[in-house]
């Protein structure tokens, strides 16, 4: 399904993110910082409100789902199998390492710290949702809006307006991922061009901002064209790329 309004939104956002990255890594980093603060602020509001207005009895039956220890363990493993994909965006850090204004020895520590903080933050958000909504309310939310976290935020504050706040935070999360992959993808093309793995034209830097302009233009153009393919094609492409990138990582590791 292709909706002109959403295609227009996607094209405009893709253009703006491309432009921001052309203007320099510092400009893109400022955008990333601002949006991350919004995400953190929305999450902290939910966590604090859940502590004040939540009920610990709502967590009963939600912590470990299963009829026995064996089924509980199976359900934990099912979630554990997919959790590595939650951290796929962190691979952008080494790709942009040359432009990070910190000692190289600290980059590894920063990556580990960022992963730990992300685990703590999203674990607290998950607990906050379970602290505010009981199992039946969660099922009702999934069958209705599908925005369980937003519904938890609305209940915690007693107003539907706060649901919009958490939705804005979620949108910021999408944009930060989009922006980070733009940074990482363009730097990957730049490095490959410098190594003559792809045409050298992708190693060209902007005369003023020193950004890989041709690589950014290519990624930006493909990103702006992608929404016209529709959701079905996009899901298929993403699945294929995820599979092939994992296979490539395995080959490189070997």
State the predicted function of each range.
Residues 10-13, 68-128, 132, 161-182:
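Hydrophobic, membrane-embedded alpha-helices of multi-pass small-molecule transporters
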